[in-house]
Amino acid sequence: LVTVPRQNGGLPMPSEALLDVRDLRAGYGETEVLRGVDLTIAPGEIVAVLGSNGVGKSTLNRALSGIVRARAGAIKFEGHDVAHEKPQAIVARGLIHVPEGRRVFPNLSVRENLDLGSYRRGAASRTQNRERVFKIFPRLRERSTQRAGTLSGGEQQMLAIGRGLMAEPKLMIMDEPSLGLSPILVEELFALIERINADGVSILLVEQNVVQSLELADRAYILAEGKFVMSGSAKDIGANPELKRAYLGM
């Protein structure tokens, strides 16, 4: 892993990290997809993971959220190693995965979809969290009784993120949130992600939209063939044309 020097300090120390991943290995069957991944996220950070299709981004998300079991390595969240915990236990700790493709329940209403994100919470907490989501996404309030399957792609993405917020996350993993959206909607969505972060939620943004991600993120990692090959401040990575050309196809 090559680290691009930062002008304003280095990577978070493990003791300061909200998420600290060390030598993570994961895969499917006999295929090892992640081949020794190290990653840190400090409280309040937006960290981007960039890379082309097929390099292991989705596997990383699934391993961090417990959907794919780690074969080796540590995933420490607030100091607790969650590498072998079940997804429900990881959610209860406040690590929430918003998957690629939105995955809303099309025949349920917007409100019912949101409430599924807070199934572990009491009624009072559910109401409070729903109001918080509606303040961030006013369109969801307007469509609260509408079936999720009738929403536009952008509205479904807002619903998927809102459902994640219902679980009171400390860290949200967002897997390709801009996929399939128009440039105008992408700008709107990234502004809303920035607002969520300003409210105290750390963000792991896994994206192919390199330009928008580097503008939003504090730091970035570049994933290639199951390993991080570069990390540093988003500003420094964005200013390196050779790096972007070699690993990001820009």
Model feature map: region roles:
Residues 29, 47, 85, 110-128, ...:
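ABC-type ATPase nucleotide-binding domains, specifically the catalytic core motifs of the NBD
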Residues 73-81, 93, 126-130, 232:
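Conserved ABC transporter NBD signature motif
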Residues 166-170, 176:
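A short, proline-enriched helix->beta-strand linker immediately N-terminal to the Walker B motif
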